[in-house]
Amino acid sequence: MTEKRVHIIVSGLVQGVGFRMFVLREASARSLSGWTRNLPDGTVEVEAQGDSGRVDELIRQIRIGPSRSSVTSIKVKEIEVDTSCREFRILT
């Protein structure tokens, strides 16, 4: 299993529509670790880590988003794996 960690910024109608909970469910279903949070500029930030294929699946789901959202852009950058990260959570 090849692990990777990505940093993601999601733009569009992504706050106030259940986006962070959607990311939490999708990441947890794939046994990924990391976190998600709203940013003051209206975007959502995500860091996700785990099996490379499962991280890619999460990225595909984030591009779609929950039904009430409208994703206009997504920026993905691969970053260094954090071996201390064991769960996925929503940051406030």
Swiss-Prot record:
GO molecular function, one term: acylphosphatase activity
EC number(s) given by UniProt: 3.6.1.7
Residue positions of the active site: R20, N38
Residue intervals of the Acylphosphatase-like domain: 5-92
Uppermost EC category: hydrolase
Record's catalysed reaction(s): an acyl phosphate + H2O = a carboxylate + phosphate + H(+)
Gene3D superfamilies (UniProt xref): 3.30.70.100
Listed SUPFAM superfamilies: Acylphosphatase/BLUF domain-like (SSF54975)
Domain of life (superkingdom): Bacteria
InterPro entries the record matches: Acylphosphatase, Acylphosphatase-like_dom, Acylphosphatase-like_dom_sf, Acylphosphatase_CS
TM ranges: none
Keyword entries, A-Z: Hydrolase
One Pfam family cited in the UniProt record for this chain: Acylphosphatase
Protein family membership: Belongs to the acylphosphatase family.
NCBIfam families, per database record: PRK14445.1 (NF011017)
Name of the protein this chain belongs to: Acylphosphatase
Gene responsible for this protein: acyP
